[in-house]
Amino acid sequence: MEVRVANVRKEFERFPALHDVSLDIKSGELIALLGPSGSGKTTLLRLIAGLERPTRGKIFFGDEDASQKSIQERNVGFVFQHYALFRHMTVADNIGFGLKVRHGSSRPPAQEIRRRASELLDLVQLSGLEKRYPAQLSGGQRQRVALARAMAIEPKVLLLDEPFGALDAQVRRELRRWLREIHDRTGHTTVFVTHDQEEALELADRVVVMSQGRIEQVGTADDIYDTPNSPFVYGFIGESSSLPVKVENGEIWLADRPIGLSAPHAPEGEATLYFRPHDVELLDGCSGCIAGTVAASRRVAGTRRVELEIGGERQRVEIELPVGHPAAQKSRVAFRPGRWKLFPAA
């Protein structure tokens, strides 16, 4: 099922939570809505679900305008962060609940509901636990039950609101891989909300980066990480460092000296240079480079993060070195960014 969000604005008591947002989601696609708190990602998910109505604009499921339809009429499956399982029901009854409460001819026979629950238990790798209650399950198992319940109604669209947010890091990593496998097997159009960029980049076919009620960028993990289109995206996705620079005659200058980077197509004047801490070339001398005094150095897993003070204004940047690299022992380090991007000064 294709989903199209067309020029949607959402206000809460005149406070704009979304500003004229448009987004096309392809049938069978796994989409991540990624952003900090207050970015509008959960509001957008709830609008797609039918839990909220747009102040302006429309939401289409296929060619049909679903803007004023309820969540039941849209036939979406919704998975909450905190599972929302019924404590007094067994696993099998929780999974079959959405089918049991259907009315009239749309309600399957009890035998069909049991068959569907058993089939989904196999899919989510919980066979043999159908008679247990939620309190007898781990957090990861409860989230699998919640996903199976959402899929039981054979939804047109599957929506997940920070589905792994309440779980510890190891379980989250395992469930991410599992969810991707489930999606590839079932082919549901799936949209999930997360503030965890690693989760979004690993899982999604495309990532929608949001900030302050607007979409900043939509693209694959490679697009978002390697070619961010705004200072916000560059700073929000992955680790980054930045320096105020200026462009003169197609060359990038830091303070009163060129740093060996050419920008022939960049506009002249003040700009901000962004680069990744791990993507730098270390240099012995500094004829056309960036040099700084080591202000701090710390071990981060298999690397060493070095904080440098640059220039008279003591602008600070971070670079990343292998743990045993001799440059980490120096008081002064010279480098040049490998991949980088310029944005006009704010």
Curated annotation (Swiss-Prot):
Record's subcellular location: Cell inner membrane
UniProt-listed InterPro entries: AAA+_ATPase, ABC_SmlMolc_Importer, ABC_transporter-like_ATP-bd, ABC_transporter-like_CS, Mo/tungstate-bd_C_term_dom, P-loop_NTPase, Sulph_transpt1, TOBE-like
Family statement drawn from the similarity comment of this UniProt entry: Belongs to the ABC transporter superfamily. Sulfate/tungstate importer (TC 3.A.1.6) family.
Catalytic activity line of the entry: sulfate(out) + ATP + H2O = sulfate(in) + ADP + phosphate + H(+); thiosulfate(out) + ATP + H2O = thiosulfate(in) + ADP + phosphate + H(+)
SUPFAM superfamilies referenced in this protein's UniProt entry, alphabetically: MOP-like (SSF50331), P-loop containing nucleoside triphosphate hydrolases (SSF52540)
PROSITE patterns: ABC_TRANSPORTER_1 (PS00211), ABC_TRANSPORTER_2 (PS50893), CYSA (PS51237)
Domain ABC transporter: residue ranges: 3-237
An MF annotation (GO) of this entry: ATP hydrolysis activity
Subunit structure: The complex is composed of two ATP-binding proteins (CysA), two transmembrane proteins (CysT and CysW) and a solute-binding protein (CysP).
Annotated residues for binding of ATP: 35-42
The protein's role, per its UniProt record: Part of the ABC transporter complex CysAWTP involved in sulfate/thiosulfate import. Responsible for energy coupling to the transport system.
Protein's name in the database: Sulfate/thiosulfate import ATP-binding protein CysA
